From Swiss-Prot:
HAMAP family hit by this protein: NAPRTase
Superkingdom of origin: Bacteria
GO molecular function, one term: nicotinate phosphoribosyltransferase activity
Modified residues (Phosphohistidine): H224
Keyword Ligase in record: yes
NCBIfam families: NAPRTase, PRK05321.1
Cellular component GO terms held in the UniProt record: cytosol
GO biological process: NAD biosynthetic process via the salvage pathway
UniProt-recorded name of the protein: Nicotinate phosphoribosyltransferase
Keyword Calcium: no
């Protein structure tokens, strides 16, 4: 039986862009990732899929990159030849992943090992958990409902394409839904359907396998884990964001220039995002908090630095659907170029409640790391003392409890 994952390209582009920096600049880094399901309840306990998950992981760890896949990676201008040579030898090691269950029938997953291994497991494991969970819930009615919703999205994108003013910056969306997809075949069907409906709007996908297969642009730069790692590397905690951005610049020399802003919140990020970074980076990515407030703060920051914000891009990727994306585009289009990464709403909108699952970096080199985020529910760490210290260092107040 073929595993759920049958290609090591079946992951998000930013795994490759981050891994390249890790390999070149801090290859000895050790990391710990922990799984969390944020759903209050599920149709059946996730513990029930443990045995199948173990088998899928065994299959995943037998995969290697093919010459064709390596050739595709070499064709991306920001991927360096020595990194592709490393990937030719690469194989995920099963011993770095522990799977267990607790007395509440919850699934426990820990990935602990070298960051150049541990970081690469995340998307694969989340996609496997999703597919195993929803496989047991699939009926013809579920697929029918998914198709009905997909066709409504395609029709809406056609309307938007017709309504766009050619003098405005374009409205562009990308698929960011690999980690929470229903299954790979459905993700491909969604992208093909929307591409056919509105080729001027659908910019690409974060999924490298599907970008290669469909001949569209792979999208992505960095994730929270990249910046968080610098909380435990050899820099003062106060300077970790600057060190991470500097490291990125050193690797990519102006390429892949979208910076993620919410590891310790937008206000703390902007204090570090000085004229040098603001000129060098093409734009910013929003992943938590009120997107309108966030974008207005970005605009004020560029104004203060006397940078024309119309030359910069705001990328939004937090819980979006087509309507929210279009509304944000209307609000910001006269001040910024915009881009929208839509995840679960594209790849797992089938009528069931989607799983809100994450596999987050919680330790690096034996030291706690954390994300404060602009949305309190997205804060994640295994060390509340470190979290309090991080708040103090970056002057981030405790979120108000309702």
């Amino acid at each position: 039986m073929t595993g759920i994952i049958h290609s090591l390209l079946d992951t998000d582009l930013y795994k490759f862009t981050m891994l390249q920096v890790v390999l070149h600049q801090f290859p000895q880094t050790h990391s710990l990732y922990e799984f969390r399901c944020r759903n209050a309840s599920t149709v059946y306990p996730l513990a029930d899929i443990k045995e199948d998950l173990e088998a899928e992981l065994d299959a995943l760890c037998r995969l290697r990159f093919t010459h064709d896949e390596l050739g595709y990676l070499r064709s991306l201008r920001f991927i360096k030849s020595d990194f592709v040579d490393y990937l030719e030898l690469f194989q995920l090691q099963r011993r770095f992943v522990e799977i267990g269950t607790d007395d509440k029938d919850r699934l426990n997953i820990r990935i602990e090992g070298p960051m150049i291994q541990a970081m690469f497991f995340e998307i694969f494991i989340l996609a496997i958990v999703n597919e195993l969970y929803f496989r047991r819930l699939e009926t013809p009615a579920v697929i029918e409902e998914g198709e009905r919703r997909l066709q409504a999205k395609a029709a809406r994108l056609k309307e938007i394409a017709a309504a766009q003013n050619p003098d405005d910056p374009p409205f562009l969306i990308s698929d960011f839904g690999t980690r929470r997809r229903y299954k790979l075949a459905w993700q491909e069907h969604v992208i093909r359907t929307l591409l056919e409906a509105a080729p001027s709007i659908v910019r690409g996908t974060s999924n490298v396998f599907l970008a290669k297969k469909l001949g569209i642009t792979p999208i992505g730069t960095m994730a929270h884990e990249f910046l968080q790692a610098f909380q435990a590397l050899d820099v003062r905690l106060r300077n970790f964001q600057k060190a991470a951005l500097e490291s990125w610049v050193h690797e990519y020399r102006g390429d892949l220039g979208v910076a993620l802003t919410d590891v310790v919140g937008m206000d703390a990020f902007l204090r570090d995002f000085d004229l040098y970074f603001a000129k060098l980076f093409d734009g910013l990515r929003h992943d938590s908090g009120d997107p309108y407030v966030w974008g207005d703060k970005a605009y004020a920051h560029y104004q203060k630095l006397k940078i024309d914000s119309r030359t910069k891009m705001l990328t939004f990727s937090d819980g979006l659907d087509i309507e929210r994306s279009w509304a944000l585009h209307q609000y910001f289009k006269d001040r910024f170029k915009t881009g929208f990464g839509i995840g679960t709403n594209l790849t797992n909108d089938m009528g069931h409640t989607p799983l809100n699952i994450v596999l987050k970096l919680v330790e690096c080199n034996g030291q706690s790391v954390a994300k404060l985020s602009d949305s309190p529910g997205k804060t994640m760490t295994n060390n509340s003392t470190f979290l309090a210290y991080l708040r103090q260092v970056f002057d981030v107040p405790e979120p108000e409890t309702p």
